[in-house]
A protein has these predicted regions:
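Active-site nucleophile/metal-coordination loop of metallo-enzymes that catalyze phosphate/sulfate
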Residues: 1-132, 142, 146
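Long, well-ordered, tryptophan-enriched scaffold segments
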Residues: 100-192, 196-198, 202-207
Length: 210
């Protein structure tokens, strides 16, 4: 309800002669029914991180655009991490500005921080990346390198908080899509060998490269 469709969805339903649930709706229905939290692949990832003392990295587009991801899905994963008792978990947030208004990103990130706080979670946001860098799909590797270095090599600028980093970008007339990847000071978020990574984008084409 209230989610914009597109030609692909229309053609698929017309061709099938029936309603074909898209990934967004299928995940929403799994959350509503309670089956999402027991999803085997999700539980396996959480268990591996917990039992082996590895850092859990959650990455994806923090947005309510509904094209590549949906923010409520991330909130559900945060809740699942809390229930599993994973001690070391961070979020690498990609900002939208393409399927949403150009500067809605800070509001979405504040909503995420509020959810984390309300659930007494120890999860922290470790880095923020504009989708221009983190979600390239056309082999523009010089773009992807900015995100890769922030994720794996402590590259990019550091800011005291998510808000200060995003506002700095806005002050430079840089909208959400083009935010140069930055890290949050004091948050250990580097991806190391044998760490566990969950990408919560339900559309796969723009996260294959990273």
């Amino acid at each position: 309800s209230g989610q914009m469709g597109n030609s692909e969805v229309g053609h698929m339903n017309i061709g099938a002669g029936r309603v074909v649930f898209q990934d967004l709706l299928r995940i929403n229905k799994a959350i509503d029914s309670g089956t999402f939290k027991s999803e085997p692949i999700l539980q396996e990832a959480l268990e591996i991180a917990k039992q082996n003392g590895r850092r859990l990295h959650i990455m994806g587009l923090v947005s309510r655009g509904g094209v590549h991801s949906q923010q409520e899905h991330l909130h559900e994963i945060v809740d699942a991490v809390n229930r599993a008792g994973v001690p070391d978990a961070v979020i690498h947030a990609f900002t939208d500005g393409r399927d949403t208004s150009p500067k809605f990103g800070l509001g979405y990130l504040k909503d995420l921080e509020s959810h984390i706080s309300q659930t007494n979670s120890q999860i922290q946001i470790a880095s923020v990346h504009g989708r221009y860098y983190a979600m390239d799909r056309d082999e523009r590797w010089e773009r992807v390198a900015h995100s890769y270095n922030a994720l794996c090599s402590n590259g990019g600028d550091e800011f005291e908080s998510v808000e200060s980093g995003v506002i700095s970008s806005y002050d430079d007339h840089t909208s959400d899509e083009f935010i140069v990847p930055f890290r949050i000071k004091g948050v250990a978020g580097q991806i190391r060998p044998n760490d566990v990574v969950i990408c919560f984008n339900f559309r796969t084409d723009r996260c294959r490269q990273i």
